A protein has these predicted regions:
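Glycine-rich acyl-CoA binding loop
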Residues: 106-111
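GNAT-family acyltransferases
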Residues: 1-103, 116, 120, 124, ...
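Conserved active-site tyrosine of GNAT-family acetyltransferases
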Residues: 145
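Short alpha-helical segment within the catalytic ATP-binding CA
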Residues: 99, 112, 140
Length: 175
């Protein structure tokens, strides 16, 4: 992916090693991590270890896939993490993901970032379909997926969790 990727209000950029302190606001938050397969980080040192694994994961992905930092365009304020990557690291489906700090929930940032990544996946990567895997009780995430044009398809088991599969297929040109 030609990072940074910019939207109207946001920048999606590669992680840096010094992001651990600000990323801890996300990875250390029980309110965020209860919606993921991972428990909250206990401290910044544990978040730094997770960040190193995240950066290594992204480095192993094909071009255009991975997990990245999300920040405000005007201030460079760190907001959270977003990504586009093969489901469970192996595919064949591709997942869009978003984990933002609770203090920035409700501002449309997750929707704006996810839309941008989905459009990038369709346009630049030639993807036919993108999914979001969401815990059934995560109404906020389900709302983001719906606002991105995704529809609920089915339940499924991924990452050791019972999740809902939301999906969007690339629009077809009609003549």
């Amino acid at each position: 992916m030609p990072l940074p990727l910019r939207t109207e209000r946001l920048v999606i950029r590669p992680y840096r090693e010094d992001d651990a302190t600000t990323l801890h606001e996300v990875f250390g938050s029980p309110d965020v991590m209860k919606w993921t397969p991972s428990p909250p980080s206990k401290d910044v040192a544990e978040t730094a270890q997770r960040l190193a694994r995240t950066m290594a994961f992204t480095a192993r992905q094909p071009p255009g896939f991975g997990l990245w930092a999300l920040e405000l365009k005007d201030t460079s304020e760190f907001l959270g993490q977003v990504g586009l990557f093969p489901v469970e690291g192996k595919g064949p489906e591709v997942e869009v993901a978003y984990e933002l700090a609770p203090r920035v929930w409700g501002h449309g940032y997750a929707t704006e970032a996810a839309r941008s990544l989905i459009e990038y996946g369709f346009g630049e990567l030639g993807l036919e379909r993108v999914v979001a895997l969401i815990l059934p009780d995560n109404a906020r995430s389900r709302n983001v997926a719906s606002k991105c044009g995704m529809t609920l398809e089915r339940p499924g088991r991924f990452y050791g969790l019972d999740l809902l599969v939301y999906a969007r297929t690339r629009p077809r040109l009609t003549w």
